[in-house]
Design a protein with these regions (language model features):
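Functionalized membrane-embedded alpha-helices
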Residues: 11-34, 58-102, 143
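Short, internal strand/loop/helix patches
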Residues: 26, 311-314, 328-350
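Membrane-embedded alpha-helical segments of integral membrane proteins
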Residues: 97-150
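Internal/C-terminal transmembrane anchor helices
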Residues: 155-182
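Membrane-interface segments at or immediately adjacent to transmembrane helices
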Residues: 173-267
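Short active-site neighborhood of thiol/selenol oxidoreductases, capturing the structured segment around
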Residues: 271-288
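A short, hydrophobic beta-strand/beta-hairpin element that forms part of a small beta-sheet core
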Residues: 351-364
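Conserved small/polar residues in nucleotide/adenosyl-binding loops
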Residues: 369-375
Length: 376
């Protein structure tokens, strides 16, 4: 009787662990699959933070991200239905064994602001991510130890069909969202959102408190100082960084600032309060932007001029790259400079087109390929 009860307990633990893992892996894989460019940017952040960006070819972050999201989603589906139980539980344990110490390092040293494990759908701090991964690691151990006890919801004869359909679905989803735009937009710039409202601080909300830290050098020794203990002029300035002292409320949109290139004027408020239509061509790195739809872009600009609408190209690229773009494309539209991360967040396309009116986003379209641009 005791042996039977112990077996039942082990089976219950294994299956509870299996469903916890399945939910986490399905959600994590799905939200990254619908936003392959967003996951690419996160992988690029990781590689840059660890000084490994030059180790891999340029296509690695994108294709690697698509592959990893497909693996996560497939593991989750397999665990949920009891398909490929040994393979799924082993891969889950391997992934969690790797990710748990990695996220501990991220939590301690903070080389990236967040791990990106759930994309933009659910942003966790690095410490929250580590705690989550510890729990998932325990679940992975439980599912792996009891892998033979995982209840099947699909017969062994049908395992190949579930496996094939799962992989087909997740890869098709990723490449569709890459060709178009994410079918689910978890960012503050999705269609229907008002940018100005997203920048507004609620009444009574306490803002975050930051402190400037100055790195100075004297006699070959580097030290960090604040404004309160800033030393005399015998120290040489090396670098500066901003440190978060006290976390407060942070608006969903906090780095949206349009600086017109020709005048250096901040035109953000003028654009966001304009009651007419405004076209925003978003190209976070103009030198890397796809130019296959240049004729369409110029047609939209001509249309906006003809009807009295505003048209701006937003980029983080330096002026010399903008001039090269003008020479190559014949662009006559005005340019504004903006933060690179903000531009990547606005639209998952380089370039992409956004239509706003009175600060409200009316439409967005991808300009990487003719399919989306022509339809919109």
């Amino acid at each position: 009787m005791k042996v039977k009860n112990l077996h039942i307990i082990q089976e219950v633990i294994a299956n509870i662990s299996r469903f916890i893992l399945a939910a986490a892996f399905i959600f994590s894989g799905f939200v990254k699959a619908v936003d392959p460019l967003g996951f690419q940017y996160k992988i690029q952040d990781y590689l840059a933070a660890f000084g490994m960006a030059s180790w891999f070819p340029s296509f690695f972050p994108l294709l690697g991200g698509i592959a990893l999201s497909a693996i996560e989603f497939s593991i989750g589906i397999f665990l949920f239905f009891g398909v490929r139980r040994t393979v799924a539980s082993t891969l889950a344990l391997m992934l969690m064994s790797f990710m748990t110490p990695l996220t501990l390092y991220l939590a301690i040293f903070n080389p990236v602001s967040d791990c990106g494990c759930f994309g933009d759908a659910w942003v966790l701090t690095n410490w929250e991510t580590f705690i989550k991964n510890v729990l998932l690691l325990l679940a992975a151990i439980g599912a792996f130890k009891g892998r033979k006890m995982l209840v099947r919801f699909i017969s062994q004869k049908m395992e190949w069909l579930v496996s094939l359909y799962t992989l087909f679905f997740v890869f098709t989803l990723s490449f569709y969202c890459l060709d178009r735009l994410p079918v689910l937009d978890f960012r503050p710039y999705k269609v229907g959102k008002n940018i100005l409202e997203g920048m507004t601080m609620p009444e009574g909300a306490k803002p975050s408190v930051y402190e400037s830290v100055f790195i100075l050098e004297k006699n070959g020794e580097k030290k960090e100082f604040t404004l309160e203990n800033y030393p005399d002029s015998t120290w040489t300035f090396v670098d500066t960084r901003t440190v978060l002292k006290e976390k407060g409320y942070e608006p969903a949109i906090h780095d949206f600032s349009m600086i017109e290139l020709n005048t250096g004027e901040d035109i953000t408020e003028d654009v966001l309060t304009d009651m007419g239509y405004t076209f925003l061509l978003v190209a976070h790195r103009i030198e890397e932007a796809d130019d296959s739809n240049i004729d369409l872009i110029n047609e939209v600009y001509d249309y906006s001029v003809e009807h009295g609408y505003k048209f701006y190209c937003l980029t983080s690229s330096p002026e010399e790259q903008i001039e090269l773009w003008k020479d190559k494309t014949g662009a006559e539209y005005p340019f504004c400079q903006m933060d690179d991360i903000t531009l990547k967040t606005m639209i998952r396309s380089n370039p992409g087109l956004m239509l706003i009116k009175n600060g409200t986003i009316l439409n967005k379209c991808c300009l990487l390929y003719t399919s989306d641009a022509a339809d919109d």
